[in-house]
Each structure stands twice: as C-alpha cells, then as structure tokens.
Amino acid sequence: MKRVENLEVIDWLLETFMLSGTITNNYLLKDEYTRHIAIGNLFIDFDDRNAFIYLRRNGFYRVYYLINQEDRTFSFNALQPLVLEILYRGEKNFPQNAKSFWELSGFQSHLSRDSYFLKNTAANEILDLRASQVIKAHSHEHISFTKRLIDEYLDLYTGDNLSLEQIESFVSKGLVYLALVDGQMAGILQADHKNGIFWLGHLVVDATFRGEGVAQKLLKYYLNEGAIAKCNQFQLWVIKDNEAAVGLYKKHGFNNLNKSTFSMLKM
C-alpha cells in the first residue's frame, strides 16, 4: 500500500487499469481525490491486472477497485479493516463473480442495502407540523446528540458516520431534524439536497424512545420539508433485512428502486 502524493498518480492508475470491461466500484470524483490527497488519506496498490484505491476513514479503509482479472487473489496487508461495497441492479444481476474474487482474497459478506424512492407529487401536501415535536437542530447540544446517535447505533463500516464538522455543516443548512419526547431529545434525521433529489441520509432513534412513533414523526417532517422545497424525488438506502425500517418507508409510499449494494469486510 502506497500513499498517493499527487493527482498524477491517480491519473496514471485510471489510465492503466480502467479498460473496456473493467469491473469497478470507483465513483470518486476529481475534487474528492484532491481533497483526500491533501490530507494524506489516499493510498493505492496494484498488480499487473488489478488495482485498488484505499480511502482511510476513522478506524478502517474503504476500498475502491478496478478488476480486470477475477480468477486470481491479491494479498491485502492493511493494518486496519478493509471494507468495500458492490452495486448491482436486481437479484438476477447479483455479481457473484466479484463476490467470489473478494472471498478468495479473505473478505467476508457484511451487509446488504436497497435503495427506495418516492416521487414528490401533489399527493405530498404541505402540512402544518408545528405540534409534531420535531425541530431543526441548531445548538451545540443538538450537534453532540446527533453525533452520539450516529456513532452509537449505525454500522461503523457502512453507516457513513459523519464527522462533527459534517454535522455542523448540515445543521447550518437546516438539514438535521430533531425529535423531542416530553422535551427530551429522542431521535434525529439528517437530509441532503443533491441534483433535485432530497436524500434521507441518516435516521436514528435513541433506544430509550423506540416504539413511540419517533421515526414516523421524523419521516413526516422530512417529507414535508421536501414538499416545501419542491424537490423532484425523495431517496434513501436501507439495510435489506431491517423489516421495521422497510415497512415504515413502504407505509409512506416509498418503492424499491431495484438498486442494491452488498458490502464485504476483511478484518
């Protein structure tokens, strides 16, 4: 594993290994490469056919791959866990060959997620939710609570755990919603606007308040905010076997986008 010192290294890697028929999950953009290189968090490794980009996160590396030969193994020698996600559309297109490649290299299956969407139509009427006990997070206490819930309840490797700086940025834009129960902070929902889509990034309820309809209140508030903003579509990712969450989203009109990922982990 070699640290990337400049963008020219990435340009060479992509030019050399991104070929017709290359299997890849590499969706990093140029500005992301530049940002991660500047703080020393980007690394690469390769052989004569396959290449790997490692993005260092808090306690693990996220792996982006360019595979041109699947019937071989690779010796991964990272000192921290490695995690990757493989995107596919529909169970009939499940990438078994890619899964086998990673299993031969010592990776194990971790989590599977599905994407759900909801069109923003006239049916999503704007409601008066002032009595819903959901507010927009705005204080240091709210930020700390959001950070604690995300760190405590979401999967470390695939939960997209946000830094304090990222949470502060979302709060400053009015995109973190806080549910209260009898004045106590009970749950959060973090949203984001991207290209006309209003994404649900994180929805977490403190264990003390589960079963009290907190998630539903947060979801309704989020849908209302999207209707006010006239977004084109709502979208989210949910763990495939999280029946309670899937049921909640379906109840509010979300449909499966036929787009899934499964993650693999090497400790």
Predicted regions and their residues:
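A short beta-loop-alpha structural element at the N-terminal edge
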Residues: 1-15, 131-146
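Conserved acetyl-CoA-binding loop-helix of GNAT-fold acetyltransferases
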Residues: 69-82, 205, 211-224, 228, ...
